[in-house]
Amino acid sequence: MPAQLLDGNALSKKLRAEIAARAAIVTAKGVRPGLAVIVVGDNPASQVYVRNKVKACEDVGFHSVLEPYPAELGEEELLARIATLNADPAIHGILVQLPLPEHIAAERVLEAIAPEKDVDGFHVSNAGALMVGKPEFIPCTPYGCMKLLESIEYPIRGARAVIVGASNIVGKPMAMLLLQAGATVTICNSKTRDLAHHTKDADILVVATGKPKMVSGDMIKNGAVVIDVGINRLPDGKLCGDVDFDAAKYVAGWITPVPGGVGPMTITMLLMNTLEAAEKASKP
């Protein structure tokens, strides 16, 4: 029997309705949630992601500012613009779309964003707060993954969770969230020996490597929840994840589709973080 789908589009629709309702309340108090999105260069994937984020803001009643810059933009110019946005009371969240051109140090840029406006949750102070279980903002993709697990009331406490991919954006914060929810967590990376030995033991398997279909069906435990964070374009133009969906769906109990799984949830949790930043700003 095929796995049940963890439908990110359906859950996003429900959550965005709640976000829009809360945004209307805070806007009525004179604080309209505002998000500034900065994109440097003309990376086609970045352009698509940015357009989707701006449209999502408009759909829930947020004020959004899209700031596109040429790839030649200097690092100091970008830092100066971030400083201006940090001081702008109409902006509650600042997002710098990654990747940045090679001449710009992404770490320096991300740490220039005021922590209270760091709605991506990448600032070192927010990462540290997450580590000790007191997050200001949870990184959007792991946050969305946790919401998907919550939506099926999955019993995380005591479960064996395996994360393939150890990035600061997904793997590490995902591990912290699952650990805090009571799971026993293993993080695998490119140096991990016998990856299948670990993945086949996972009740919850989260894959975020950027490698198309690298996790095959025979690497998955029967009945596992499989969350595929990857989105890759194949030579024929089709999109696929980091998991071989067609094989995995006959082994897993639950699985996220690609597209339509984690992707829409990432944007939805960006909206949630921006809303919460605005709600905090509205309090006297």
Swiss-Prot record:
Q: Give the UniProt record's GO annotations in the biological process aspect.
A: L-histidine biosynthetic process; methionine biosynthetic process; purine nucleotide biosynthetic process; tetrahydrofolate interconversion
Q: Which family does it belong to?
A: Belongs to the tetrahydrofolate dehydrogenase/cyclohydrolase family.
Protein name in UniProt: Bifunctional protein FolD
- Which reaction is recorded as catalysed by this protein? (6R)-5,10-methylene-5,6,7,8-tetrahydrofolate + NADP(+) = (6R)-5,10-methenyltetrahydrofolate + NADPH; (6R)-5,10-methenyltetrahydrofolate + H2O = (6R)-10-formyltetrahydrofolate + H(+)
Q: How does it assemble?
A: Homodimer.
The record's annotation in PROSITE patterns points to: THF_DHG_CYH_1, THF_DHG_CYH_2
* Keywords (A to Z) from UniProt: Amino-acid biosynthesis, Histidine biosynthesis, Hydrolase, Methionine biosynthesis, Multifunctional enzyme, NADP, One-carbon metabolism, Oxidoreductase, Purine biosynthesis
Please give an example of a GO cellular component term from this record: cytosol
Pathway the protein contributes to: One-carbon metabolism; tetrahydrofolate interconversion
Q: Origin, by domain of life?
A: Bacteria
User: Do you know which InterPro entries this protein is assigned to?
Assistant: Aminoacid_DH-like_N_sf (IPR046346), NAD(P)-bd_dom_sf (IPR036291), THF_DH/CycHdrlase (IPR000672), THF_DH/CycHdrlase_cat_dom (IPR020630), THF_DH/CycHdrlase_CS (IPR020867), THF_DH/CycHdrlase_NAD-bd_dom (IPR020631)
Q: Name one Pfam family in it.
A: THF_DHG_CYH_C
Biological role stated in the UniProt entry: Catalyzes the oxidation of 5,10-methylenetetrahydrofolate to 5,10-methenyltetrahydrofolate and then the hydrolysis of 5,10-methenyltetrahydrofolate to 10-formyltetrahydrofolate.
One MF term in the entry's GO annotations = methylenetetrahydrofolate dehydrogenase (NADP+) activity
Give the signal peptide range.
none
Write out the residues that bind NADP(+).
Answer: 165-167, 190, 231
- SUPFAM superfamilies the record matches: Aminoacid dehydrogenase-like, N-terminal domain, NAD(P)-binding Rossmann-fold domains
Annotated EC = 1.5.1.5, 3.5.4.9
